[in-house]
Amino acid sequence: DNGRRCGYISVLLFFNQMGLTTQVPMQYEIVSNKATNEYRETSLAKSRIIIRKPKVPVTEKNYMALQFLDMLKDVDVYSEMSGTDLQKRLYQYMRDAGLEISDLESYFSYYPDKLYKNLIETRVIYNGILA
């Protein structure tokens, strides 16, 4: 979009890139400002692509926070890591991405209650406080 960020990869591909799963997705999910519907499926080459509308407009400033929260919402479903190993991986990602809990808080209300449960169980909510 004229050199501006308008989306990000989501779900299994992002979990795989973070090293949280060894699964290689057969389909790719993209969250994009360009999505015209809440959910659309298409194909590119031999890959199935799912395009979703973002919860809020995606920008260069917020895409990492939104991508991280999307992942965290489903971390209990897709992650092959748990406990301290998972916590360390999530904390490391937050450090590398320059994310603080304060960067994420304004987006919490756009996510289901399950996010709050995962924030506590992974201890991400305590990053920088008790870590």
Model-derived regions: residue spans:
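Exposed, interaction-prone assembly regions rather than primary DNA-binding/catalytic cores
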Residues: 5-63, 89, 95-107
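Short beta-edge/loop segments at beta->alpha junctions of small alpha/beta modules
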Residues: 1-2
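Hydrophobic alpha-helical interaction segments
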Residues: 52-131
